[in-house]
Amino acid sequence: MFDTQREELLWGGRKLVLETGKVARQADGAVVASYGETTVLATVVSMKEPKPGIDFLPLTVNYQERAYAAGRIPGGYFKREGRPSEKETLVSRLIDRPIRPLFVEGWRNDTQVVVTVLSHDLENDPDIVSMVAASAALTLSGVPFMGPIGAARVGYLGGQYKLNPTVQEMEESSLDLVVAGTDAAVLMVESEAKELPEDVMLGAVMFGHKHFQPVIEAIIRLAEKAAKEPRDFQPTDLTEVEKAVLEIGEADLREAYRKTVKQERYAAVDAVKAKVMAALVPEGGEAKFEPEKVKAAFKEVQAKVVRWNILDTGSRIDGRDVRTVRPILSEVGVLPRAHGSALFTRGETQALVVATLGTGDDEQFIDALEGTYKETFLLHYNFPPYSVGETGRMGSPGRREIGHGKLAWRAVHPLLPPAHEFPYTLRVVSEITESNGSSSMATVCGSSLALMDAGVPLRRPVAGIAMGLILEGERYAVLSDILGDEDHLGDMDFKVAGTEEGVTSLQMDIKIAGITEEIMRVALDQAKEGRAHILGEMAKALTAARPELGEHAPRIETMQIPTDKIREVIGTGGKVIREIVEKTGAKIDIQDTGVVKIASSDGKAIKAAYNWIRSIVAEPEAGMIYDGTVVKTMEFGAFVNFFGAKDGLVHISELAPQRVAKVTDVVKEGDKVKVKFLGQDERGKIRLSMKVVDQQTGEDLTEKLKAEREADRNRERQARQSAGE
């Protein structure tokens, strides 16, 4: 019934298995891939006819995690997977980025890649095996895909690179780098690092590229046995159209791209395009070429003109040379009520970044395959359409916004203080108010400034820069701080963030083959130079965290209590903790480890809650005097609340120095009294005394009463002696 084909190899100390022909046989390509006990299903379906009226590749990648893969049932009311999680969105992008450049130019058939996690062993992250499975499914599908690609994760432990470290090993690694590419070239890099040098980062990229070659070979072997016949597709030849466009518009395009203001440049380019269209596709006249071909050729000519200008003259669209960073202005404290804020402007790219400090109540609960965990650092990136002078959809964040936010998160995260030193939940929001390239790196710079403005003790300021590349044969130019046009028309998007000590995040997307290790080294070195310049400009606004938290930020004090006292602090059904919160106004978070976080913008509220909790968990000292309140009277004595939530008994014999016939003759419920803690009886009951305490001054009368009793005994003894004489 099944014509199953299979490839196996030992990779990174674990078995990788690729299998096809058994599951999802109606898809154009389907591969079940397993790594350890993590298993995914990747499918590819591409429509038979091109989608009309579009000039881009209609590729969609969906990565989805199923809770059953880890033996779990989804949370929430419906107990069913819903909208994609952040992890699913990020992995979808991770798969998309290296495969998109490998589709043959001109492919306009709707193509969908779906990767489903079927099993997760909680050791091997599904993202790498998902990329491998998607590559294999595309290679088998018959669509014009110039792969396959391989992918690998690289860690850095004890000064050594580690191929595909486990989830547990990643906790100790100073590097989390994912690299993907073909047998000949690197196409994509995504990473977070703990301030590592550039040569270590580049070494990790090349280490990963070398070690995923066996995976590519396994996919090729599988394709030789199971691949479908290639689709009959011939890319459109635009050679003649491009010649015609160049003849009409090259000079005007070169002039348009000398305009340094973005909106003026766009208007000039649109005018050239209209001139070309009028000449080659005249209204009411005979068209020399199809309109869609002319539009496609014009885009190609645009790219060539920009690239030729840069390679021939070393001068870029806005007049800069290849190494110069646009003018930078950094401002902090721009929003009066925000805990921390910054406005970072670099040329025509601007980010308004706001940092907010919260408490344990504000932590984000994330329901992942590995289980539910809390996230205390959130970074959200918003890209409204007005930032590029357009109208558009507003609403929930798209994939691009989530991806850019995570890139900035990775850049800043390694610099944050540990939770036990700075027990705040942090949320950073970046509002991109203007954009002309490199807005994610503006977010990194603005986030660093906003957090320091809020008083968050970052180890060092962090900055980011976006690099570009123009490659034509043997000639190339690496561009620092690229514009939006240079990003779209160039061959590489290379983002590097870090401090003066090293790199914290590296993201690379390469659109063509031929990017050598040497070119990447030049780009990294040039990025380091640019990053140092940007850090210097940022230092004009702020060089380190402010010594105090923002005026409106909550204050948090932590205390450690014995774990066996947690129940007493919470109380039956939460009664005690609710009372503390209601009466002090402070927020209280108690962790299973006994760490208590008390938060409020009012220092007095924190102190009151702190003392209350301390009184519950602390033990009274024998012989000490405490203020108390009579809470109940009995025939044999009075119960007094005296040490926070502690109650003790003042026996009738301890109420007053003289004999007491009736308890209520001395005290009534609600009376404020002073008591001395005598200790506990054999049953653990607390014993108190009032008679040895001056109820006015709180003075301990024990010695005074003892002296009086001794004097009384002496007088009695003398009286008896006198009577005997």
Curated annotation (Swiss-Prot):
GO terms for cellular component: cytosol. Mg(2+) binds at D487, D493. It catalyses: RNA(n+1) + phosphate = RNA(n) + a ribonucleoside 5'-diphosphate. One of its GO terms (molecular function) is polyribonucleotide nucleotidyltransferase activity. It is an enzyme of class 2 (transferase). Residues 699-725 are annotated as: Disordered. The keyword Oxidoreductase does not apply. Its main location: cytoplasm. One of its GO terms (biological process) is RNA processing. Residues 701-719 have a biased composition (Basic and acidic residues). PANTHER family: POLYRIBONUCLEOTIDE NUCLEOTIDYLTRANSFERASE (PTHR11252), POLYRIBONUCLEOTIDE NUCLEOTIDYLTRANSFERASE 1, MITOCHONDRIAL (PTHR11252:SF0). This is Polyribonucleotide nucleotidyltransferase. The lineage of its organism: Bacteria, Pseudomonadati, Pseudomonadota, Alphaproteobacteria, Hyphomicrobiales. The gene is pnp.
